[in-house]
């Protein structure tokens, strides 16, 4: 999945719009369209991506070159909301329970690596290494999607009700990526059964003869 929008930048971040363009992941020695993160005093370079929808999975980073530190440290923060992606662990209820959503990773030149296994829509990336720059070719979402046959459907004359039904069905589907009702790993996996209950109750209440088949 390609990011849909850049919501925030901090420090020295150049050519950030390059991350919104679809590119091949094959990395060459002279990529013409890269986003550059540079730390040379002042706030660390950082940005916040919006993928436009919530999904289960992680992100894939394609790095062209790094200068300064050979294996720069990046901080990744995943969130179902902007507030969560911008929060530290312990702030506003954010946590790393069950599946880390806030952690540090190392990268290197000419690398193509995947990180994260959680539920999110937004991700913030910070360059932590001082006196270092990183040229990012691409950041994409890696969608973990179990192929499940939908047994029912619902459509009516109210577009809003149709949307509510679709969101409820999609929520149930996201929470079935591993064992049945096991849920996508995210900040608080224990909250998953509650989400499933709301979605499944809604679907059950709409089970009107001739409407859901």
Regions found by a protein language model. Give the residues of each.
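An alpha-helical repeat/solenoid feature that recognizes helix-turn-helix modules
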Residues: 192-198
């Amino acid at each position: 999945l390609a990011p849909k929008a850049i919501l925030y930048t901090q420090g020295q971040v150049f050519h950030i719009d390059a991350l919104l363009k679809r590119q091949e992941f094959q990395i060459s020695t002279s990529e013409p369209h890269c986003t550059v993160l540079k730390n040379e005093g002042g706030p660390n370079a950082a940005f916040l991506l919006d993928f436009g929808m919530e999904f289960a999975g992680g992100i894939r980073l394609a790095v062209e070159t790094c200068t300064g530190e050979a294996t720069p440290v990046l901080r990744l923060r995943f969130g179902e909301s902007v507030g969560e992606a911008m929060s530290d662990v312990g702030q506003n209820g954010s946590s790393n329970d069950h599946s880390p959503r806030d952690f540090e990773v190392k990268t290197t030149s000419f690398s193509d690596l995947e990180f994260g296994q959680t539920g999110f829509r937004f991700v913030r990336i910070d360059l932590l290494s001082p006196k270092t720059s990183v040229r990012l070719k691409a950041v994409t979402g890696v969608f973990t999607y179990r192929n499940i046959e939908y047994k029912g459907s619902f459509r009516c004359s109210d577009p809003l009700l149709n949307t509510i039904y679709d969101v409820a069905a999609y929520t149930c589907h996201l929470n079935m990526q591993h064992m049945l009702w096991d849920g996508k790993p995210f900040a608080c996996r224990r909250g998953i059964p509650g989400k499933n209950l709301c979605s499944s109750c809604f679907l059950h209440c709409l089970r009107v003869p001739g409407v859901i088949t």
